[in-house]
Design a protein with these regions (language model features):
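Conserved AMP-binding/adenylate-forming
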Residues: 36-76, 174, 178-182
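Conserved AMP-binding A3 loop
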Residues: 22-25, 125, 130-160
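AMP-binding/adenylate-forming core of the ANL superfamily
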Residues: 302-323
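Conserved AMP-binding/adenylation subdomain of ANL enzymes
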Residues: 157-175, 183-225
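Conserved AMP-binding/adenylate-forming core of the ANL superfamily
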Residues: 5, 10-40, 150-153
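Gly/Ser/Thr-rich phosphate-binding loop
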Residues: 237-293, 302-304
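Conserved pre-ATP/AMP-binding loop-to-beta segment of ANL
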Residues: 5-12, 114, 119-137, 169-175
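Conserved helix-loop-beta element of the AMP-binding
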Residues: 108-110, 155, 175-177, 224-227, ...
Length: 323
């Protein structure tokens, strides 16, 4: 069985994340992950409800190292969480909040660094390519939310493909700030896996309001990469406030008009990219709406038509998917 390292190599254990202005090295992150992995209960599934992106990532990779599947709900609504807890065997909840999101399952709270207690070099776990690491859910806009399982190897391939495309647009790896939820496929891929598995740097914040986005960007060193939505982007441009220099901007979740993309590029001075993807497929194509009408698929992704359906195959996809 083929395996992959839990984290890609980083000469000298370079910076992997920023937490409220403080740089966190790859080695420190790895120590956090392995320390938490030792504390995790014996279980098959974890409901990762951390609100801080850094602690979410620590919990996510700790679970991977223990062979535990992260269950990532598409909504924090109590009824949705209750349904997941009732329907998922061998489940516990992980969060950085004082009160547990649910009293139906065991709860483990995290959020206090233990990396300073570690010494020496930590052994890097090797993860089976086909190990299931996450279960994500569709939005339910066309019916009941559907669960989709993801494996480590396929998500690594997807992160590599996104890194190739995005770092090309940005002219090099960046620190990634996201305004989007990281338990959804877009946010997980672009604000957690792209920086950690794709050679960038993760930012712990998830700002919503324009002033908060500008403040969070100002905490980060250049080059900066903003992962957002058309809604957040429009509000940011309308706010008419000073925005720190960006290397590139990425949008998804709703169609990005050419007018808005062009306005963003003119105002922010950075290439404005748009992603095509879904929970089922992950992201499979991009375009630059200001100058491109057609989508450009990721390396290895092939499309073909069967009657009135478009089928995607190859690349990081485990099987053929109808778009």
């Amino acid at each position: 069985m083929s395996t992959l390292p839990l984290l890609p190599d980083s000469p000298g254990g370079g910076v992997l994340a920023y937490r409220y202005g403080r740089a966190v090295s790859r080695d420190e992150f790895l120590h956090e992950v392995l320390a938490l992995a030792d504390r995790l209960p014996k279980a098959a599934h974890v409901l990762n409800m951390c609100m801080d992106r850094y602690w979410f990532a620590v919990g996510f990779f700790a679970a991977i190292s223990r062979g535990i599947v992260s269950v990532l709900p598409n909504s924090p609504a109590p009824e949705h969480i209750a349904s997941l807890c009732a329907g998922t065997p061998s489940l516990f909840c992980l969060s950085d909040q004082e009160l547990p999101p649910s009293n139906q399952v065991p709860y483990l709270r995290i959020g206090q660094s233990t990396a300073h207690l570690s010494s020496g070099n930590a052994d890097l776990p090797q993860i089976p390519f086909d190990q299931c690491i996450a279960r994500l859910f569709t939005s339910g806009s066309t019916g009941e939310p559907q669960a989709h399982s993801k494996t480590f190897g396929r998500m690594q391939l997807g992160a590599n493909a996104e890194a190739e495309r995005m770092w090309s647009a940005a002219k090099g790896p960046c620190t990634v700030l996201g305004t989007v939820p990281f338990r959804h496929m877009y946010g997980l891929e672009s604000t957690v896996l792209l920086p950690i598995l794709g050679g960038g740097r993760l930012c712990t914040r998830t700002p919503f309001f324009p002033a908060d986005i500008a403040s969070a960007l100002a905490e980060l060193p250049a080059p900066r990469f903003l992962v957002t939505t058309p809604f957040h982007l429009r509000k940011l441009l309308d706010a008419d406030i000073e925005i720190p220099t960006l290397a590139a901007i990425l949008s998804a979740t709703a169609p990005l008009s050419r007018e808005l993309a062009s306005s963003a590029e003119a105002r922010l001075g950075a290439p404005m990219m748009e992603i095509y993807g879904s929970t089922e497929t992950g992201q499979i194509a991009t375009r630059r709406p200001s100058s491109q009408l057609e989508w450009e698929t990721y390396s290895g992704i092939k499309l073909h038509q069967e009657r009135d359906e478009t089928i995607a195959t190859g690349g990081h996809l485990e099987c053929a998917r109808v778009l």
